[in-house]
């Protein structure tokens, strides 16, 4: 039985700290441990976030070390180099693979048997690295994938259509990055096909709107990084959502980074696809309808990632 009363965050940069703050507000855990190469940074973030506890649920947030992962239910890894202006997520790979080669064995040595959630970028590649190095069951090691990208898509569509984002069902799949694919053909608003709902709201130029929205969503991280040098609040909420689904065993459908086994003609590469997620990690992948163009783009996206992983010394 996994101890979902305790979570460990490895990495206390912008994303890690914002995620712990979001998790504190959610009140999901009794304990959250912060681990960072800079112990004082972890201590400072733990102190700062802890001062918000009186406004929420009682819990314990503190700096620790890898011995703390032994009895944790979830370990979240955000540690890694930051994406710089003009740098793609894939440009980060060599820096962050090296960091993971030092982190994952430390976790494995402690006999951790919970859920390992990868958030550091490039998340699809690093999820595969973590799967290979951790020795954990495949369904217990997955990445945050395109959960944030899909939320950005739903937000953009909600603004475009003046409708609640919670009523919009649409996924971005493939790479969490430049080759990501919007699954337009399966998108709907409370069961109404997206194109029909757009027409109902007075929007008829579907192709132009789809291209514009997809480009804006894909480039949103770059736009934010140019303005404030990092993105962290949106992904923190994505981490919170994934943890809620795991802890509560919601069996919700989320587009997370998983290893493919021939689905859509894609083999032995981690990409983001909709999956049922619960307390035992990934329960199953959920097939979605793709048109020929979307399928071709998905396969190209997976080819980019597979070539990169195959080039790594693991």
Which functions belong to the PLM regions below?
Residues 16-17:
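N-terminal Rossmann-fold NAD(P) dinucleotide-binding loop
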Residues 25-31, 135-137:
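Conserved S-adenosyl-L-methionine
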Residues 31, 35-73, 87, 306-314:
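Conserved N-terminal Rossmann-fold NAD(P) cofactor-binding segment
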Residues 12-13:
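Glycine-rich Rossmann-fold phosphate-binding loop(s) that bind the pyrophosphate
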């Amino acid at each position: 039985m996994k101890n979902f009363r305790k979570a460990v965050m490895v990495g206390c940069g912008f994303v890690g700290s914002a995620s712990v703050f979001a998790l504190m507000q959610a009140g999901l855990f009794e304990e959250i441990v912060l681990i960072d190469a800079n112990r004082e940074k972890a201590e400072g973030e733990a102190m700062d976030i802890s001062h918000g506890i009186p406004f929420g649920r009682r819990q314990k947030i503190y700096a620790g070390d890898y011995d703390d992962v032994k009895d944790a239910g979830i370990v979240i890894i955000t540690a890694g180099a930051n994406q710089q202006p003009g740098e793609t997520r894939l440009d980060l790979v060599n820096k962050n693979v090296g960091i993971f080669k030092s982190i994952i064995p430390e976790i494995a040595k402690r006999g951790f048997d919970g859920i390992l959630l990868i958030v550091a970028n490039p998340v699809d590649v690093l999820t595969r690295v973590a799967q290979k190095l951790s020795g954990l069951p495949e369904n217990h090691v997955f990445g945050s994938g395109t959960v944030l990208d899909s939320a950005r898509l739903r937000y953009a569509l909600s603004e475009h259509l003046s409708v609640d984002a919670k009523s919009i069902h649409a996924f971005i799949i493939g790479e969490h990055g430049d080759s990501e694919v919007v699954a337009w053909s399966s998108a709907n608003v409370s069961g109404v096909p997206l194109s029909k709902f757009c027409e109902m709201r007075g929007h008829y130029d579907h192709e132009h709107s789809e291209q514009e929205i997809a480009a804006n969503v894909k480039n949103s991280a770059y736009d934010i990084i140019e303005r404030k040098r990092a993105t962290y609040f949106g992904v923190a909420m994505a981490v919170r959502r994934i943890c809620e689904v795991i802890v509560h065993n919601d069996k919700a459908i989320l587009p997370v980074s998983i290893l493919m086994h021939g689905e859509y003609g894609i083999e032995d590469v981690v990409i983001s696809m909709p999956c049922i997620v619960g307390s035992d990690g990934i329960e199953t992948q959920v097939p979605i309808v793709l048109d020929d163009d979307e399928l071709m783009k998905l396969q190209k996206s997976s080819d980019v990632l597979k070539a990169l992983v195959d080039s790594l010394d693991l």
